[in-house]
Structures are given as C-alpha cells and as structure tokens.
Amino acid sequence: MNDLCTDIGFMSVNKFGEQLCGDHVEVIDQSDDSHVVVLADGLGSGVKASILSTLTSTIISTMVANGMSLESCVDTIAATLPICEVRKVAYSTFTIVRTIDNREAEIIQYDNPKLILLRDGKSFDYPQTETKIDGKTIYKTKIDLHENDFLVFTSDGAIWAGVGTTMNFGWQREEIVEFLEKMVRPDFTAKTVSSLLLDECCRLYGGKPGDDTTVCTVKIRRRKSVNLLFGPPRDPKDVNKMMTLFFAKEGKHIVSGGTTSTLAGEFLGKPVETQLDYLDPDIPPIAKIEGVDLETEGVITMSRVLEYA
C-alpha cells in the first residue's frame, strides 16, 4: 500500500422522457489499490439500451473479477456484441479504466468519446495503440499516474449536448477539454468533476437531454485518514477499550449515533452540544463534542451517506 488512493465518481441523466438510462457504470475493487471501472453505452435509449449496456459492463466486470486479462475481456465483448444492421455500429460501446497500485492505468476504449486526462490542470496527450478485433477498432493505453490526475470519460450524450440548439454541431471534445481546464481545481473530488460536467451538458440540452448522458471521473489523490465510530460495543465493559483505540487513531474522528456520542462525551469528559440547525429536514441535526471532528445521528444519516455515495 502506498500513500495514494483512487477516487471514483460517476453520474448519469436519462434521455428526456425515458425511465431507464441506456448507459451503465460498473466498478470492481480488485484490492485497496487496484480498481476496474467500466462505462458502457447501449445503442439508442430506453429498455433495450439499458439491457445492452448492463450486459456489456457486467460481462467485462465478471471476467475481470475472475482473473481474466483485460485483453480477453475485450476479445469476448467485441466478438459477442452484434452490429446494428441499420446504423452499422455496435449495439454497445465501452470504456475500461483499470488502475494498478494507484500508480499506473490501463485504458481500453471502444467507440466512446476519447477519455480526457487532466494533469496539472491541463489536458495531457497520452499515447494510444490501435488494435483490430473482429473488425472493431480498439484503442489501448498504459500510462503512469500522478497525484491529482483526473481521468474523465463519458458516453456520447456529452458530445451531442446542445446539437442544433445552443451548439451547431454539439459539444465537441476540444470544447469539453477547455471547459474542464477552466473549471476543475486540484481539490475537487471525482464526484464533483462528474457533477460539474454533467450539469453543463444538461444546461446545453436546455434541461431536456436528447440522449442518455453519463460522466465518470477517476482521480488519483493522497490518502486521508478518517475514523468512524458507529454504535456502542456489545459488552458495556469494552467501552473504554473501544474509545481508547478509536481516539488513538491518526486522522479525523467522526462519531455517529446518539448513544455512541454520549459514550464518547463521557470518555472525553466533554458535554454533547446538540445543534438546532437543520440543513435537511429529513436528517437529524449534528452535535458538537470537543475533541471530535464531527458528530451525527446514526442510521438515518448513514443511510443518506450511502445514497449519496
């Protein structure tokens, strides 16, 4: 394990009037330091596109999870996916990003918009190797990663944003790069970058997306230690032991749950000061305990955290 980690964030918006998204993102954690991210875009929109993109990303992720090489996954998918008889294009396109030890990345791209790598705030022109598999053109890349690198990749809904309305020919890759170089800061999370770009796509579409649009961002950042204490020990005799171990840990300390907060306050000899400000009426307010970086309610708050994640 090194001092870097991989931050992954993605967001999607459905084509206007559709209930299902024709894009699908699958993430596999091979270890704490190695991850595989697959973004698949099914042809068209609606149920058919959703099934095709889910099938594509699931096949790739399942093969990777079982130790198959990325090349074998690509061979299988490229040979399996049919070509639309009318449009003469694949029924599903995909982008695969695999990070290894948070220090290098393997990128495989098939018919999705070309991945954008932001390094030091500027677009980095990375090398690509072109390969033909069953008549399909696959682009492969293997590069070293640096701290605060952002790998941003999208479905083709992004480059069609605003076509025929706010933009004559859609939002071209060069314009997306210019937008990202202008807006992205090193302290942004992967989810923030994805949200920022997707919001701009929706704005260009006039709030009525003409295609399913997905943005996925992979960021390499330095690790930050956060310790979360949620719930009291089963045996009340273990309270002091648990609190001693918890507060001895390096990094931020978060305590969740009313009973747990009371125990933490007693251990520290500090009162629990409940705040009355509600940022969300559905979420109980936080409290303050001297020596604790953040104190929250338990189950409801943690459920919302998982929802946002």
Provide a role label for each language-model segment.
Residues 33-45, 109, 144-167, 218, ...:
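Conserved beta-strand-loop-short alpha-helix elements that form
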Residues 160-244, 248-250, 270-309:
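C-terminal catalytic subdomain
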Residues 18-31, 125-163:
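Acidic loop->beta-strand submotif enriched in PP2C/PPM serine/threonine phosphatases
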Residues 24-78, 152, 164-173:
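Primarily the active-site beta-strand->alpha-helix module of PP2C/PPM metal-dependent phosphatases
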Residues 21, 52-121, 138, 190-218:
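Catalytic core of PPM/PP2C metal-dependent serine/threonine phosphatase domains
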Residues 104, 248-253:
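Short active-site oxyanion
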Residues 260-270:
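Short active-site loop/helix that positions an aromatic residue
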Residues 1-20:
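Regulatory cytosolic signal-relay segments
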